[in-house]
Structure formats: C-alpha cells, structure tokens
Amino acid sequence: MHNKNNTILQTIKGEKTSHTPVWFMRQAGRSQPEYRKLKEKYSLFDITHQPELCAYVTQLPVDNYNTDAAVLYKDIMTPLKPIGVDVDIKSGIGPVISNPIKSVSDVDKLTQIDPKRDVPYVLETIQLLTQEKLNVPLIGFTGAPFTLASYMIEGGPSKNYNYTKAMMYGDEATWFALMNHLVQVSIDYVVAQVEAGAELIQIFDSWVGALNVQDYRYYIKPSMDKLINGIKAKYDVPVIMFGVGASHLINEWNDLAIDVLGLDWRTSISSATKMGVNKTLQGNLDPSLLLAPWDVIEQRVREILDEGMERGKHIFNLGHGVFPEVQPDTLKRVTQFVHDYTSK
C-alpha cells in the first residue's frame, strides 16, 4: 500500500510531520447523513454486529472529512454483554443495565472475555478496514475500569455516582474485585483489537473526573497501571488517555505509561505544558463551538494550533465527542483548516 498517512503515529514518536494530525471523538456516525439513514433501519448494536456496516460507518469520516485517523464505531459497553452484564442502549438515556453489581458475589458471577468467541464482529470490522481499505491508522478503544464499573453499579448513566462511591468507600473488597476483573477484560479486549489491526488505543475514562486526586490515587490508579502495563507487555501500541472534567488528574495521568494525554476544552495546551505534562497532547476545541459561526471556529482552532505548534507533539481533536447537531461540512472545513494552517 502506498503513501499511508501515518502523521498521527509520527507525532506521537516526536518525529517531524507535514502537518498537525486531526481526528474527532465520535467522528463516526453522529451527524453524518449517510449514518442517519442507516440509523432509521438499524440500532447501534445492529450496526456494530455487522462488520461490513460497521466498517462503512467507521470509514465515512476519513473519506468525507479527510481525518488523519479512523476510530472504530462502537460503544464502550460492547465487552460487557459477553461477561454477563445485561445491558441495553436506550434512546435518549444511554446504556441501561438491569443487573447492577451490589456485592462481591455479583462480581464472582461475571465471566472473562474471549474476544474471538464473544466479539468476533469487532475483530472482523477491524480486519476489513485495515486490509487495504484505510490509508490512515485505526484507533481501537475501551472504557476504563472506573467508567465501566460506574455504569455497572449505577445501572446506567449517573449525575453524582452515589452508589459507585458508596461501594468504593464502604465495600473495598467488592470494589477492588470489580476493578481487577474489568482490568483483565479490558486488556484481553484491547490486545485482540491490536492483533486484528488497530494501531492506537484510546482509553475513555469518561466519568473519572467525579473523583478527587486522593481517591483517584488509592482506588483507581493501581488499576490503570495494571491495565496500561498489561497492554504494553503484549504490544508497544500507543495509548491515548481521555476523560472529561478531569484536569485535576492530569499529573496523575502523566505518571501512567500512556503516550497521549487527551485534554477536554477546560484546560489549554499551554497550561497542561506548564503543569509539567510531557506526553503528546490531544485536543481540545470545545465541541459546542462547532455550532458557532465559522470565523469564531477558525479563530479558536487557530489559537489551539498555535499553542500546539509551539509545544510540538500535538494531535488536534475536540475536548469531547461531536454533537449530532454539528454540520458535517463544518468538520470537513476544520480538518482542512488544520491541515492548511499547520503545513505552512
């Protein structure tokens, strides 16, 4: 295959690149008209279970927007069903779990994952994409143990994580048993994605910002160390860490054996650099800005790129996922602008 665009991998290695790489969290699906047409007929689980469809949705933004990476279209809940979690995606709510974890005996009932047997459709999608179709690296992903555990304990999305924190503080045996279980599930799931052809992995710890630094260090960080070191022990694949509203944890993340630290829109690249972050930085346009007039978007994107170019080792992205209301043409223009502005 000729001229594969490996800008994102080169950036992570600290090599000189022709431009700043760009991709968008939730770029696959969401606002694309082709995707919306599919969603009239199929649910999220329907699409992810059909490799041809899933590969099509994953590739759309690369073809339409010219992004420098593809990100697998699937949900962080994907590995939970096979281990015994009764999860359903309810429209307008998100994942709903009818058998929440309440005790250590509930954790004991969970099984481990065998990705080839349990999620072959995920691996087949990756194989379809990476064999000749894509000219950019494919990002695989997993939810982090805390975020997966919070869904499993709360029974769905939560605003304050009361049940999760109650278990953490009040029943450490169950908490750490669940974390250890999810670490192993996540390692096996990620390693299978890499073996199928994923060239980067993003770990989404979407909700971990709900914890303070002290609790993160004690209840979460050991599991994150195990997870990342477990992946790296098998493959030297770049790992991106991302969570929302977690700027107080940036130094904790910087200690982990990750390669890229994803910033949400609240923390600038220059302030993360001043805090001593030495990883590649990813981000961090406020996704709501994509609904603003173009001159405002361009100005904000330029500010982020200026900070990124001054620092080096920067991947342009949003500070969270694309909203469904965003016009596909806006994402195309942003990608083009990033490429043009940084290649001068």
Curated annotation (Swiss-Prot):
Function of the molecule: Catalyzes the decarboxylation of four acetate groups of uroporphyrinogen-III to yield coproporphyrinogen-III.
Primary site of residence: cytoplasm
Localization in the cell: Cytoplasm
InterPro entries named among the record's database cross-references: UROD/MetE-like_sf (IPR038071), Uroporphyrinogen_deCO2ase_HemE (IPR006361), Uroporphyrinogen_deCOase (IPR000257)
Highest taxon, organism lineage: Bacteria
Keywords, in A-Z order: Cytoplasm, Decarboxylase, Lyase, Porphyrin biosynthesis
Catalysed conversion reaction: uroporphyrinogen III + 4 H(+) = coproporphyrinogen III + 4 CO2
Annotated substrate binding sites: R26, Q27, A28, G29, R30, F45, D75, Y151, S206, H320
GO CC annotation, single: cytosol
Annotated site, Transition state stabilizer, chain positions: D75
Species for this entry: Staphylococcus haemolyticus (strain JCSC1435)
A GO biological-process term: protoporphyrinogen IX biosynthetic process
Record lineage: Bacteria, Bacillati, Bacillota, Bacilli, Bacillales
HAMAP family, A to Z: URO_D
Protein family according to the UniProt entry: Belongs to the uroporphyrinogen decarboxylase family.
Subunit description: Homodimer.
Stretch forming the signal peptide: none
Pathway membership, UniProt: Porphyrin-containing compound metabolism; protoporphyrin-IX biosynthesis; coproporphyrinogen-III from 5-aminolevulinate: step 4/4
EC number: 4.1.1.37
Protein name: Uroporphyrinogen decarboxylase
